[in-house]
């Protein structure tokens, strides 16, 4: 690894540490920097209210953003590589739509069928949503994996994934039509995405699952580098194309499914971060890109979480709105600078 690459990687890691601390300091309730430091280090006696805000609200939210951002960025890189498509992202195969459909069945039918609206169940309702999202997303992923063994071309698989997404959205539209207003509102709020839903035991489980999945995705680095060469060259070098595609899609799909289950559908991070890292590190080598997108995804998610909380104001902006507002200019600037460099050459 070149010295410049190492320096950039360390710079991103340092920015994560700074952003983590800023996420603990800034918010609707103003807590002095020194007080946050004392709370984190366990020294001094700070107000119990401040301790609860840091430990029970801001820290879980920051950790969730960090882990979710890293997972989505890795998933996006894998999808862009396997499909050789710069517009591919974690949601391209309809896995996020599958999660949304699973949640829609639970949320939109709970009141319509005479049951209790999930919005009234609090924590139990959140668990039900997570389970529904996992079932929905993994069901779609199982279908995609099955189809991937039946078709040869990546383009065909990509089109099928997009069609599955359209079908899922159509089913959601029908469910909305027959649902009561309260359930529709609860579903829309879930669909906006949030890093604040995960806390306590849920957060520990989420972090533990992602701590297993993310290192496993690094085992596919050599496979991803071979896939960059094209199917013909990769096959000549001994790569089983169908098996490799199955492993990469499964890895990306499970990462997306788990993040969506706990945080809702988070857009743009998985699409923007790989482009940003390719531009910064000037390489397509996944030995560099995989750790780069992991750290950059975590950092960008922390930035979005910080903006969404709007320090000094009550309430929070929808995370999806912030990720789009932050991610779109990033991609645009990268593409324009790349085009400018090509013209200069």
Question: What spans do the regions from the language model cover?
Answer:
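Alpha-helical transmembrane segments in inner-membrane proteins
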Residues: 1-345
């Amino acid at each position: 690894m070149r010295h410049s690459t190492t320096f950039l990687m360390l710079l991103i890691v340092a920015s994560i540490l700074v952003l983590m601390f800023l996420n603990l300091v800034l918010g609707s309730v103003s807590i002095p920097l020194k007080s946050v430091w004392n709370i984190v280090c366990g020294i001094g006696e700070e107000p119990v209210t401040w301790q609860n805000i840091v430990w029970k609200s801001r820290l879980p939210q920051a950790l969730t953003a960090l882990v979710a951002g890293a997972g989505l960025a890795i998933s996006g890189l894998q999808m862009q590589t396997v499909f050789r498509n710069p517009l591919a992202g974690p949601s391209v195969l309809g896995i996020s739509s599958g999660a949304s459909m699973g949640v829609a069945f639970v949320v939109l039918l709970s009141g319509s069928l005479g049951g209790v609206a999930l919005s009234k169940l609090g924590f139990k309702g959140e668990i039900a949503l997570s389970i529904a999202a996992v079932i929905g997303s993994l069901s779609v992923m199982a279908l995609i994996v099955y189809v991937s063994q039946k078709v040869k071309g990546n383009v065909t698989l990509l089109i099928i994934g997009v069609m599955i997404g359209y079908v899922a959205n159509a089913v959601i539209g029908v469910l909305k039509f027959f649902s009561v207003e309260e359930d529709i509102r609860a579903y829309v709020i879930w669909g906006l995405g949030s890093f604040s839903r995960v806390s306590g035991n849920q957060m520990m489980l989420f972090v533990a699952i992602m701590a297993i999945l993310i290192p496993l995705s690094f085992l596919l680095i050599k496979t991803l580098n071979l896939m960059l060469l094209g199917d013909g060259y990769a096959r000549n070098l001994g790569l089983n194309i169908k098996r490799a595609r199955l492993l990469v899609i499964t890895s990306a799909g499970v990462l997306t499914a788990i993040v969506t289950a706990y945080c809702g559908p988070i857009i743009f991070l998985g699409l923007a971060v790989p482009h940003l890292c390719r531009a910064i590190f000037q390489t397509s080598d996944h030995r560099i890109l995989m750790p780069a997108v992991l750290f950059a995804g975590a950092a960008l998610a922390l930035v979005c979480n910080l903006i969404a909380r709007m320090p000094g104001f009550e309430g929070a902006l929808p995370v999806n709105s912030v990720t789009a507002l932050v991610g779109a200019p990033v991609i645009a600037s990268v593409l324009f600078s790349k085009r400018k460099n090509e013209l200069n050459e």
